[in-house]
């Protein structure tokens, strides 16, 4: 009834499975079009709908997404606080490999342990619950300079893949560029069919002291909402994980919102696009009802 309520988690790791998620259809700005994704149903881990004056205190807990998922949704809510927890993914939809050896027509790469692969007809395929890809987009990362570039993908012109041992692969090419030892490739497909978090038609929202160790297929999208604060949040790979990438594209996307958008005391590392993006919302007219409607 709108009276303030605080929900506290017992510290620990809470695995949220795609198969058991809340499945709700949402149209979200800057995500995959209906041509590529005719069913934009989101698979939601933490779902708050039409709630008022609720605080979710994770008390240091981790919400671990298992599968391609939207970690949280706040829909038509007011006065909501999410604080003191971590968001991570068991098998991030961006895979990573490090070059151990290079020849004129081959690479030997170390696969990050969170990246699942299979070899089908000598071709390499990455996969998880609800997703897979064989081609896609890549960026390359240099640990020494800590620089990342949009780059050639080790999935291009691939003739065959051989597993030398678990998580070590021999990749043979028809042709390839010189890439350099210990280059790390961050690979993904181009489909933004889920987001990390979604704040929709809500107001007075605070995200506080949250570690976003991985941000799904898109960042936290705030759409048609009002007065949002992001304070002391960390958007970066989990320390000690060995991962170098934390997100598909933008980390925070603010679309068609109003009031005060206050992002402060926060850290952004490892995005494949902008850390913060604020803009209007493109809407396609599908029907004219009358001269004034």
Q: What is each PLM-predicted segment?
A:
Residues 45-59, 260, 265-291:
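Short, solvent-exposed linear motifs at loop/edge-of-secondary-structure regions
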Residues 130-201, 206-216:
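Long, low-complexity, polar/charged, intrinsically disordered or flexibly structured peripheral segments
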Residues 9, 55-58, 79-84, 181-182, ...:
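All-beta strand scaffolds that present successive hydrophobic residues in beta-strands
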Residues 15-55, 64-83, 91-105, 191-202, ...:
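Extracellular beta-strand-rich solenoid/capping regions of secreted or surface-exposed proteins
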Residues 88-146, 277-293:
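Autoprocessing Asn-cyclization modules and mimics
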Residues 1-8:
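Acidic Gly/Asp/Thr-rich repetitive segments characteristic of extracellular carbohydrate-active
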């Amino acid at each position: 009834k709108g009276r303030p309520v605080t929900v506290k988690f017992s510290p620990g790791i809470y695995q949220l499975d795609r198969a058991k998620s809340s499945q709700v259809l949402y149209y979200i700005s800057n995500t995959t079009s209906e041509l590529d994704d005719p069913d934009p149903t989101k698979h939601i881990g933490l779902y708050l709908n039409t709630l008022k004056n609720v605080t979710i205190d994770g008390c240091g807990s981790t919400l671990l997404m298992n599968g391609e998922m939207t970690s949280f949704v706040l829909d038509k809510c007011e006065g909501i606080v999410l604080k003191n927890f971590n968001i991570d993914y068991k098998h991030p939809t961006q895979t990573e490999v490090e070059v151990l050896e290079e020849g004129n027509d081959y690479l030997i790469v170390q696969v990050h342990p969170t990246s699942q692969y299979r070899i089908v007809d000598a071709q390499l395929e990455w996969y998880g619950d609800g997703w897979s890809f064989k081609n896609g987009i890549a960026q390359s990362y240099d640990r020494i300079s800590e620089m990342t570039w949009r780059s050639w993908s080790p999935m291009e012109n691939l003739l065959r893949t051989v597993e030398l041992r678990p998580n070590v692969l021999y990749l043979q090419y028809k042709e390839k560029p010189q890439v350099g030892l210990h280059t790390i490739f961050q690979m993904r497909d181009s489909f933004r069919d889920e987001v990390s978090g979604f704040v929709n038609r809500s107001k007075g929202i605070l995200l506080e002291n949250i570690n976003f160790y991985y941000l799904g297929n898109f960042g936290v999208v705030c759409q048609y909402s009002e007065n949002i604060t992001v304070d002391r949040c960390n958007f970066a790979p989990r320390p000690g994980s060995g991962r170098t990438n934390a997100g598909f594209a933008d980390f925070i996307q603010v679309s068609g919102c109003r009031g005060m958008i206050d992002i402060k005391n926060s850290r952004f590392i490892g995005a494949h696009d902008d850390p913060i993006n604020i803009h209007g919302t493109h809407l396609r007219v599908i029907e004219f009802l009358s001269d004034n409607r």
